[in-house]
UniProtKB/Swiss-Prot annotation:
Belongs to the methyltransferase superfamily. RsmC family. It holds the Pfam family MTS_N. This is Ribosomal RNA small subunit methyltransferase C. One of its GO terms (molecular function) is nucleic acid binding. It comes from Vibrio vulnificus (strain CMCP6). The gene is rsmC. Transmembrane segments: none annotated.
Length: 340
């Protein structure tokens, strides 16, 4: 069985497209195919918004790796290899941002699973130049194209979606970039969590902060707390920072692969835990979050999360804390609480 994802396998079949090129890899890349690519190219750089993948790929000196919500560095790339992301809006964002950086004349290769909507590249790329499908395998497609027009200048501020929420009399302005969970809307799970939260004090972590809804609400309702917000996704971090700024709130926003970069003395860990990874469901991060939570809480520390009721989280929480209470429940979501 190949160590590569299906999109990487179809790219591997077409290595001639990359020979002698300066390649910039971006999008939903999840494996070490860029290392093999580097053996055939003049240079390979990887831009990722996924902090977990960045921590993995940055250890390899044969390629240059960047993490962020936009590529700040100058690039000499003449070919963009785009792994099609799960959200169409994120694909549009990546094309606009990266082609503005690479300019007219650059080539593009797009790979992705057919179920991810990769076919959308045919219409999406029309503004830049021609693109055509050249291979199909493993339920994936391989497209090649060329940017023949000078792309518009990119301004990240143009890509934020803005919306307002009002919970318990707290009015908040939310800023959300493409690629963020529940982009541009207030999800019902987070709403139930905010309606249920008790008064908070001390150092509080919003784990998996997304667009910053939960963290901003906690800071506005409990102005004395020391707020920290983390996420694996760079678009989420940029969105949370923008949400805090839009509401005149303060908090430390940082990247963390589960607990890789967090403190270990929180009074509260509050979360709407992520359980989707790409197009698939992945419970590992949430199970680690819950199972290891006591190690990152102070002696009086408490964990409060919202989760889909069908997820088997209570036994994990019970095993970690020796207690687990349900604070609130609807037919779809449950609020779980545990304390040390």
């Amino acid at each position: 069985m190949s160590a590569y994802t299906a999109p990487s396998q179809i790219a591997q079949r077409q290595l001639d497209y990359f020979n002698g090129k300066h390649v910039l890899v971006a999008g939903e890349v999840e494996d070490l195919f860029p290392l093999e690519l580097a053996e055939h190219c003049e240079s390979v750089s990887v831009f990722t918004s996924n902090y977990s993948y960045f921590r993995q790929i940055r250890a390899h000196s044969t390629i240059t790796s960047y993490f962020g919500s936009q590529l700040e560095a100058d690039s000499q790339a003449d070919l963009l290899l785009l792994y099609w992301p799960k959200a169409k809006a994120e694909a549009e964002y990546l094309l606009a941002m990266l082609l503005a950086k690479l300019g007219s004349g650059c080539e593009i290769v797009v790979v992705g699973e057919n179920r991810s909507g990769v076919k959308s590249i045919e219409k999406m790329f029309q503004a830049y130049g021609p693109v055509n499908k050249y291979d199909s395998a493993r339920r994936c497609s391989f497209y090649w194209g060329q940017c023949n027009t000078q792309p518009n200048a990119f301004n990240q501020a143009d890509w934020f979606r803005h919306y307002s929420i009002n919970i318990h009399g707290q009015q908040l302005e939310i800023q959300s970039l493409p690629g963020v969970f529940s982009h541009g809307e207030f999800d019902l799970g987070s709403q139930l969590l905010l309606e249920t939260l008790p008064s908070l004090s001390g150092k509080v972590l919003d784990f998996g902060c997304g667009a910053g809804v939960i963290g901003a609400f906690m800071a506005k309702r409990n102005p004395a707390i020391e707020l920290e917000m983390c996420d694996i996704n760079a678009y989420a971090l940029a969105s949370s920072e923008a949400t805090l700024a839009a509401n005149g709130l303060q908090g430390r926003v940082f990247a963390s692969d589960i607990y890789s970069d967090t403190a270990d003395d929180y009074r509260f860990i509050i979360s709407n835990p992520p359980f989707h990874s790409g197009l698939d469901t992945n419970y590992k991060a949430a199970e680690t979050l819950l199972g290891q939570a006591p190690q990152y809480l102070n002696k009086q520390g408490e964990l409060i999360i919202v989760a889909n009721s069908f997820l088997k989280y209570p036994p994990i929480i019970e095993q970690a804390f020796s207690n687990c209470a349900t604070l609130n429940k609807t037919n779809k979501f449950s609020i779980y609480h545990a304390s040390k």
